[in-house]
Amino acid sequence: MASILNRAMLHGGDYNPDQWLSSPDILARDIELMKQAHVNCVSLAIFAWSALEPEEGVYTFDWLQNVIDRLYENGIYTVLATPSGARPAWMAQKYPEVLRVDETLHRNHYGDRHNHCYTSPIYREKVWEMDSRLSKAFGNHPGVILWHISNEYSGACYCPLCQEEFRHFLKEKYKTLDALNAAYWTGFWSHTYTDWSQIEAPVPRGEMLLHGLSVDWHRFVTQRTVDFFNWEKAAVRAGGSELPVTTNLMSFYYDLDYTKFADSLDLVSWDSYPSWRTDPRGDVAVAIHTAMAHDYMRSLKRQPFLLMENTPNQVNWKQINRLKAPGQNLLAAMQAVAHGSNSVQYFQWRQ
């Protein structure tokens, strides 16, 4: 049934029924409301790791099976996510090395979302196990049409493992320290490197003035992130599913080079949250910027894309969060479609 991606406009959004398992009547109510709203697709399990594996090695997929089945019986398809964007507390407690080291070179405590190291062997092992199990369980379900790999990849880790991978990245690029020193012009201020182990990522309390180092670090962060995406994609394939894969990008997110994701994605999707009625430049400028973002997403693979997230009302992270004006939600949806989106999806269905 993956062909629905090519023969229908997807309408729906993120749905997190794992938050409402204590109230089973909510699912029936939500399905009825979805049908009234002509919803034909929802994204599931994006932040559901703790509900899917409440304890290490204890997998509870029954609730997800029930939700996917019930939705499909009512003509609603599932974009199934891998939940790597937010790991459970038990994992951070037992394996603190999965947590990121920030640019002050301190390891983070548990919390937030993208607070995990893409290089950590343990985190990769846990992600592989989860993703491949989800693929085996649901990857060939007739109601599942697309894999939503992780969520809004972002950020960087400065742990010793990532630092060593960065040095390997530089060795692959420059081959010799002489070539690297020449490219970075390290003779200025006597910053010449004499051993690969001396090279560290640019940080506030370390080297910040070698522009070549900073550019290469950002390129490395993109490479690490794409590598992790491909790791998740391989896990899904190992579980037996050949459904297309995507991940939700974030407009002009300058910390990652999205053009490097294009070859790994089967289709592009992104999350659009314009500052309607809030940006001091005015809504015309916001609309122009959003139009350019839509065009950028279409350009990545030179094909239609999916609007994976937007809000029907207002965002909640600005100092001032104004509601959209009457008719503005429809206008934003039509703008996305006009620029090549094959979907209008929202975050989130219930909150």
Language model segments and positions:
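Conserved, mostly hydrophobic/aromatic
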Residues: G13, M34, V42, L71, ...
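Polysaccharide-binding and catalytic clefts of secreted carbohydrate-active enzymes
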Residues: T104-L267, D271-M292
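Hydrophobic targeting/anchoring helices
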Residues: H109, T246-Q351
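Surface-exposed, active-site-proximal loop segments in enzymatic domains
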Residues: A48-D62, W90-P121, P160-Q163, M208-S214, ...
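Short, well-ordered coil/turn segments that N-cap beta-strands
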Residues: R7-H11, H38-N40, Y72-T78, N140-I145, ...
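Boundary/entry segment of secreted carbohydrate-active catalytic domains
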Residues: A2-P24
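Aromatic-lined substrate-binding rim segments of carbohydrate-active enzymes
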Residues: L27-N108, S132-S135, W231-G240
